[in-house]
C-alpha cells in the first residue's frame, strides 16, 4: 500500500497529510478518474506533476528489505497498488503493479510507448506525433484492473505460505 512509500516522500491518500485531506479545486478521487482525465486533461496533468511525481524519491528500508527477501528466494512476488516504481528501484524483479506505474506512458490513439519524462516533467497536455494524448500507464477510477496482472497476483497469493501485507489501511 501507499504507506510503504511515505518514508520515501511519496504522499499517501488517507493519512492526515494524505492527498484526500488536501485542498484542491476538485476532490482527488475526481481528478484521478477516467472521465475527469478525458474532460479536463490540463487539470489532471497539473495535479499529476504537482502531486504524483516526486523527484528524488529513493527506495526506503521496506522496499530494500523486500528486494533482499526476493534475492534470498524467500519472496516470490511483490503485489502493489503503488504507482511509484520504488520496488523496482530497490531491486525487486517480480513486481505486480495492480494500479500501473507513472514510469510508463503511452499514446491513447496509437498505443506508442513514451518515456515518462515527457509526461512527468513536460508542460501542458503531452501529445503523440499522431495527435493522440499521451497518458501515464496507471489505472484511473472508473477503469478496470489489468486481468493478466490480477490473475498473476491471485496465483501468487494462493500459492503463498506466508503473506506480508504492509502500508495499507485495508
Residue locations for each model-derived region?
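Conserved catalytic core of sirtuin-type NAD+-dependent deacylases
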Residues: 2-170
Amino acid at each position: 500500500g501507499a504507506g510503504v512509500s511515505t518514508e520515501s516522500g511519496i504522499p499517501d491518500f488517507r493519512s492526515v497529510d494524505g492527498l484526500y485531506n488536501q485542498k484542491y479545486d476538485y476532490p482527488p478521487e475526481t481528478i484521478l478518474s477516467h472521465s475527469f482525465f478525458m474532460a479536463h486533461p490540463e487539470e489532471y496533468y497539473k495535479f499529476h506533476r504537482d502531486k504524483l511525481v516526486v523527484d528524488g524519491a529513493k527506495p526506503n528500508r521496506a522496499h530494500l528489505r523486500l528486494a533482499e527477501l526476493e534475492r534470498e528466494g524467500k519472496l516470490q512476488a511483490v503485489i502493489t497498488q503503488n504507482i511509484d516504481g520504488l520496488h523496482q528501484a530497490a531491486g525487486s524483479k517480480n513486481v505486480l503493479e495492480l494500479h500501473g506505474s507513472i514510469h510508463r506512458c503511452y499514446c491513447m490513439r496509437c498505443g506508442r510507448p513514451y518515456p515518462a519524462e515527457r509526461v512527468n516533467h513536460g508542460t501542458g497536455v503531452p501529445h503523440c506525433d499522431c495527435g493522440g494524448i499521451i497518458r501515464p500507464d496507471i489505472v484511473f477510477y472508473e477503469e478496470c484492473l489489468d486481468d493478466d496482472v490480477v490473475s498473476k497476483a491471485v496465483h501468487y497469493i494462493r500459492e503463498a505460505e506466508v503473506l506480508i501485507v504492509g502500508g495499507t489501511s485495508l
